[in-house]
Amino acid sequence: REQKFPDGQIVGQSVSLGHILRENRSFEVPADKWETRKVAIIGGGIAGLSAAWKLKKENFSDFVLLELEKEVGGTSASGHGDPVGYPWAAHYLPVPFQENTELVSLLEEMSLLEGRGPEGEILAKEQFLCREPEERVYYKGRWYEGLYLQVGASEDDKRQFAEFQKIIDDWVNWRDASGKRAFVVPLANCSTDAKVTSLDTISFGDWLRQKGFTSERLFWYCDYATRDDYGLNADQASAWVGLFYFCSRVRKSGVESQPFITCPEGNGQFVHHFLDKVKDNVRRSHIVVSVVPTEKGVDVICLDGGDIRGFHCEKTIYASPMFTAPYVIRGFRDETPFAAAEFQHNAWFV
């Protein structure tokens, strides 16, 4: 008997709050509504929460984190069900390479790691790893393991897939003159060699065509990858981010990509951990409407229900979506450090 899907719902940012930013209203803060903090963190997603966690680890507490929603988490938000929680969006974390020391430190703090392998590789505890098969594709009424559909593939499809995989292996092994990988997490450790950065000037689709790939199955596979991670198809995403998807999680050629750490609530487990450490510094339902650079630092103006509040700060960490920066940061449109106005935002449906 056909099973009826449960009714769904859309959760996330409040439209009415977003309209306040778009309308670019001016707000006057009453004199008795100003506070002073050395640092204000704007945004309570993983970026803002991890920044707050880092400050606390450095024994720095003179900061405030401002989140516009009633709950923190952003795109790592989760819900509470019976008997277990569930993710609304981001739901796994690839086990990091040993060089990613900050992230390894966090995972150790959360007791998610088992230890090290013979080559120093990070080993996560089995109970926190995604069960096999990690990935499946649904085709003509059946599930098949993996994301590339081997069933029904022609000899030419298989040949092109093998050629594509060889290119990926070559990039995984590639190092620049200083020993840096082309694609790795964190991004700060990626090579800036022109051979690598030039890949950001063409689309992934064009790169595939330039390499002579014509297999529809291979194009579907690559298109799925960019849609999955970036919300863009292969002709919208750059070749750099396309190759990053396939290379950054592979320790060395010939081995499988890193396993996934996951929990019932997805990446909500990290949200809960961070929040437990910094909850006294968090202000929920505070929508930041203006960030104004001053001679002494930065003034941050926000709405708290019907109240207008302000914070005199030395510095701010802007951990909100980048497309909002031109609407919030005073002068950002005039001296923008990057093309923030060109950012497009896609909703994340699960």
Predicted regions and their residues:
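Extreme N-terminal leader/targeting segments of oxidoreductases
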Residues: 1-39, 57-58
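Short, solvent-exposed loop/turn and secondary-structure capping segments
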Residues: 53, 75-78, 104, 147-149, ...
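Glycine-rich FAD pyrophosphate-binding loop
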Residues: 56-82
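Dinucleotide-binding Rossmann-like beta1-alpha1 core, especially the glycine-rich loop
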Residues: 84-173
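Active-site rim elements
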Residues: 88-97, 189-197, 256-263, 337-344
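Central helical "cap/lid" subdomain
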Residues: 286-350
